[in-house]
């Protein structure tokens, strides 16, 4: 299965970009929600001493991100993500360094090209995310339902996005559903 996706995508790559650390994100504010910092551009790939933390992004001729290779702690080994674009959704297929399928996700978009839902299924369970926007197109909430291997729903988390008067992101709160507790996971 890996070879099918790799061959299909590799033939469509028209340019590559190299970064130390993750740089591009598919879902809004994903770096802030998980505590990552955006990666740094690598100007000369030949000067890299280790592939750990190396991100190689492949783009097609329409400049769509279609491949992500993530360097891991084992030298010259990568995790692979292949992105396939359709009219109203994008499919992501994620493999580990031994080329085993770990996860498949579907990103659903509305007419404004905003993500509205994400469905994912992996070896350890799955998830469903709903993205809610206000009248000015600002993301205000993500509702994340989590499922175990047997597709039994476990926890539900809510990410709430707060903006300042200039409509700039001010903070992100995380809270479990049906609980008054919330935690600030990012603030400016």
Predicted features along the sequence, with ranges:
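Buried hydrophobic residues that stabilize the cores of well-folded domains
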Residues: 1-188
């Amino acid at each position: 299965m890996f070879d099918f996706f790799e061959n299909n995508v590799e033939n469509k790559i028209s340019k590559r970009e190299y970064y130390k650390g993750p740089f591009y994100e598919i879902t809004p504010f994903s770096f802030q929600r998980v505590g990552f910092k955006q990666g740094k551009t690598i100007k000369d790939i030949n000067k890299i001493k280790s592939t750990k933390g190396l991100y190689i992004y492949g783009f097609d001729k329409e400049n769509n991100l279609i491949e992500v290779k993530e360097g891991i702690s084992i030298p010259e080994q990568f995790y692979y993500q292949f992105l396939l674009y359709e009219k109203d959704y994008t499919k992501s297929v994620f493999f580990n360094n031994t080329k085993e399928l770990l996860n498949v996700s579907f990103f659903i978009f509305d007419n404004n090209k905003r993500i509205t839902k994400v469905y994912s299924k992996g070896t350890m369970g799955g998830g469903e995310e709903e993205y809610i926007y206000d009248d000015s197109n600002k993301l205000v909430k993500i509702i994340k339902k989590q499922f175990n291997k047997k597709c039994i729903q476990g926890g539900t988390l809510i990410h709430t996005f707060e903006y300042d008067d200039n409509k700039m992101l001010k903070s992100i709160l995380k809270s479990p559903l049906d609980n008054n507790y919330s935690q600030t996971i990012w603030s400016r």
